[in-house]
Every structure is written in structure tokens, then in C-alpha cells.
């Protein structure tokens, strides 16, 4: 039975199942595992050990799932969704489990894409796009792209564990959000499974085509058509409200991604419903394949670690540093530096910092040559480091950015070779694992992240 037949309306959000009072006893029945096992080619695990493994993710939350399915294909996902829709059983797509707000745990049938749906399907170097399954880690995806001189730009700290599907679901960005967009800006096309098990593809279409298609949708048309109709109606009727209520932030991922669709219509006269899935955390549809656009790998990078006596000094320096057009600016506070000092892997590096260092800013620049990278660092230090005396012999460039703000940095460590830059970045990206590994009763438990 279609959603419109249940409710008598063309609005998918009015599905009567949204009022279903879910209780675990309603779905924990002997035949559930056997039914799913007969429907899919992948793994179906409902044993206590597996359920306990999937009851946690990188967050502080814990919730025992109903069971776990590792799908082998889009057909498997379709079978699970059709069955669970008919039996009113919640379904939760799971990627790498790296999110810190509990997105990957719930009392549901968990679909684990990382185990079996993790392939690169096609690379188009000329078009700078790649098509891949949702379970591939970002690190492995970029390793596959490196020979082409291309990369998938969103780079969360746990890129060796974060997967493409989760990146889209979370609308991830990363340390290089100064240069690159969030995941939504790279979605070209997605193959998805809808709530009723329908498989469809969302990609670019002319905005007028969307509205014309929506106008022809009737109350008994399939769910896919109802979605187009609902998106069209919301974009038309709520245009002014979307503009007014959505914050003008480069890293806003709260709420459904209606502002991105509105922005695309304004800028290019086109709309991509697939971009609405970015940040939806699997609540709108389940991605089974994604075609995403790519960025060129920079020819060279230069990194400098600016040290400060106080965290507030580092914070005051951020705005002037941004005037120099860095590719990344990342902070390391006294807690992280103190713990890193007691970590064998980073103790030597932290030991080279000036005595009394309370915090540091890792600043990175992209460049075409090593010399250009050195010049950009010299320009920054001439502006932000009092009494800077360049060991490289480089003076600040004529016309280089200078600010009226007082400089606060105490010292600087420069890095132009891959090995030293990697050490700086590894210490920054190891921040959360270092915090979680501290001994004693005092522990860091992340549960609210990236607020402003």
C-alpha cells in the first residue's frame, strides 16, 4: 500500500507510521532473523556478541540494536527495507561509527556498509569524479585517486575509519574547510533506497523541470514522485523562510539541507535532490552508491606551528592569520599538548616547543613550489611573530598581508618536508584518541560536538 493510500495526502511526512509507538518486544520475534537471512546474500547477525559490538560507536551512547545486516548489494538493502517497512521495524544505516553524537546506535536493524559494500566503481579523471559504494573509507578512496592527482576533499580527522556514506550522512567537512566545501558541495549523483524499498537515483535537473514534474504528481503516484512534489512545494512555499532562518555559516550542518538546494537554484538554475541527503543521517533515504566530484591534489604544502603562552592569544591571532589565505588553521590547547608530552609518539615533538607553551596553532599553506610555500610562511611570520628573523633568508614579500592587530605568537616551527608535516598533522588528528586514553578517573566524554 502506498504512503498516500494510507494517509489520503501527497505529503510523505504525513505517513501514519510516524505515530507508531515502537517497542522492542514488537520486533524481537523468532522469525525475524530467519526471514531476513532468506532475503539477502550478505551477512545477517542477531547473536548477542554482534549486537553488543554494534551497541556503541565513538560517542558516549550505548543502545542495543535489534540485529545487524551487512548487505552485499543494493538488492540486499532493498530487501531489508521492504521487509522492515511492511513490519514497521526501524532501520539504521551505519558507516564507520566515528560520529560523536550517537548517530550510529539505536534500537533498529543496523545496516553495516563497511564490511561488504566498499568498492570504487568508476573513476573519471577528465570529469574529476568518482563513483563508489558507501562503505569505502575516505583514506582508501583517496589512495585509489592519488595516481590521478585527485582527491575527495572532505577530510575528517578519522579519515582512515570514516566512510563515504557516513561522510554524506553527516555532511562532513574537515581541517581544510577554509578551502573546500562540505560533503554536500561534492554530491553529483546518488543511488538510494527509499523507505518503502524503492531504488532510485537523485542527480542534477533543471529547477523548472523539478517544478513541472512535481505539478504532474497525483495522490496515487509512487513515493519517489511524492518526494519530488514535496521538495518542490517546500522550496516554493518556504523560500523566504529558508533564507531568513538558516544561519549564514560555512560549516552549518543542522537541519535538513534545504538552504543548499535553494543556493544551487539561485546560482545555477538547477537542483540536486541528492544534496538534500547530506546531513540527514540516513533519515530520508539510504545511499547505496555515490558519484562525487573531486579536487586536484596541491603540488606542495607548507606548515608552520605557531606557539602561544595563552589560549586566548591563539584565538586572537586566528582572524589576522586568515588574511594570509591559509589552507588550514587548527588549534592545540594545553590539555592536548600536556597529554601529547606524555605520549611516546609525540613527546620529542612537544619537547621542542618553548618552555611555557600553553597552546599552538597549526597553519598550512598550499603552493605550486617549495619556494612559494616558504614565502607564504615568511609573510605570515613577518606579520604575526614579533622579532621574526627568517632562517631561510626570505624577507616578507612586498605587498604581503599585514594587519593592525598586535601579534601574539611566541615562536614558530616550520615544516616543508612530508615527514615533519605528517608529524604535526598526526599530533593534531590524534587529539581525541589522546584525550580518551588518559589514565585516572577524569575522562573526556564527547557528546555535543562542533557547536558555535
Regions from the language model: what does each represent?
Residues 1-452:
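Noncatalytic alpha-helical scaffold of FAD-dependent oxidoreductases
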Amino acid at each position: 500500500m502506498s504512503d498516500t493510500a494510507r494517509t489520503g495526502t501527497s505529503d510523505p511526512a504525513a505517513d501514519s507510521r510516524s505515530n507508531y509507538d515502537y517497542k522492542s518486544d514488537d520486533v524481537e520475534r523468532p522469525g525475524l532473523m530467519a526471514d531476513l537471512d532468506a532475503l539477502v546474500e550478505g551477512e545477517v547477525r542477531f547473536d548477542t556478541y554482534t549486537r553488543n559490538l554494534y551497541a556503541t560507536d565513538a560517542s558516549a551512547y550505548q543502545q542495543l540494536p535489534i540485529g545487524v545486516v551487512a548487505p552485499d548489494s543494493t538488492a540486499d538493502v532493498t530487501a531489508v527495507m521492504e521487509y522492515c517497512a511492511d513490519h514497521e521495524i526501524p532501520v539504521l544505516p551505519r558507516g564507520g561509527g566515528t560520529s560523536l553524537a550517537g548517530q550510529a546506535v539505536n534500537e533498529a536493524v543496523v545496516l553495516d556498509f563497511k564490511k561488504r559494500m566498499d568498492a570504487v566503481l568508476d573513476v573519471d579523471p577528465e570529469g574529476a569524479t568518482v563513483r563508489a559504494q558507501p562503505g569505502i573509507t575516505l583514506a582508501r578512496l583517496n589512495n585509489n585517486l592519488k595516481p590521478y592527482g585527485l582527491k575527495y576533499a572532505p577530510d575528517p580527522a578519522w579519515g582512515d575509519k570514516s566512510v563515504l556514506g557516513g561522510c554524506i550522512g553527516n555532511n562532513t567537512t574537515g581541517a581544510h574547510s577554509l578551502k573546500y566545501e562540505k560533503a554536500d558541495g561534492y554530491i553529483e549523483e546518488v543511488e538510494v533506497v527509499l523507505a518503502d524499498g524503492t531504488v532510485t537515483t537523485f542527480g542534477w535537473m533543471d529547477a523548472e523541470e523539478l517544478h513541472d514534474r512535481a505539478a504532474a504528481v497525483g495522490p496515487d503516484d509512487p513515493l519517489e514522485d511524492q518526494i519530488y512534489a514535496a521538495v518542490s512545494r517546500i522550496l516554493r512555499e518556504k523560500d523566504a523562510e529558508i533564507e531568513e532562518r538558516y544561519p549564514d555559516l560555512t560549516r552549518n550542518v543542522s537541519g535538513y539541507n534545504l538552504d543548499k538546494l535553494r543556493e544551487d537554484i539561485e546560482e545555477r538554475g538547477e537542483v540536486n535532490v541528492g544534496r538534500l541527503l547530506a546531513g540527514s543521517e540516513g533519515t530520508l533515504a539510504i545511499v547505496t552508491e555515490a558519484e562525487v566530484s573531486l579536487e586536484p591534489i596541491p603540488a606542495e604544502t607548507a606548515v608552520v606551528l605557531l606557539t602561544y603562552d595563552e589560549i586566548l592569544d591563539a584565538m586572537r591571532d586566528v582572524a589576522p592569520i586568515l588574511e594570509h589565505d591559509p589552507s588550514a588553521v587548527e588549534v592545540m590547547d594545553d590539555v592536548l599538548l600536556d597529554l601529547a608530552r606524555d605520549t611516546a609518539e609525540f613527546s620529542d615533538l612537544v619537547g621542542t616547543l618553548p618552555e611555557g607553551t600553553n597552546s599552538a596553532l597549526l597553519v598550512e599553506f598550499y603552493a605550486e613550489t617549495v619556494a612559494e610555500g616558504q614565502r607564504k610562511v615568511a609573510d605570515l611570520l613577518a606579520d604575526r611573530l614579533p622579532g621574526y628573523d627568517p632562517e631561510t633568508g626570505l624577507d616578507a614579500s612586498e605587498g604581503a598581508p599585514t594587519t593592525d592587530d598586535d601579534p601574539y605568537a611566541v615562536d614558530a616551527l616550520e615544516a616543508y618536508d612530508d615527514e615533519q608535516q605528517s608529524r604535526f598533522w598526526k599530533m593534531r588528528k590524534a587529539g581525541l584518541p589522546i584525550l580518551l586514553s588518559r589514565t585516572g578517573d577524569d575522562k573526556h566524554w564527547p557528546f555535543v560536538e562542533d557547536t558555535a
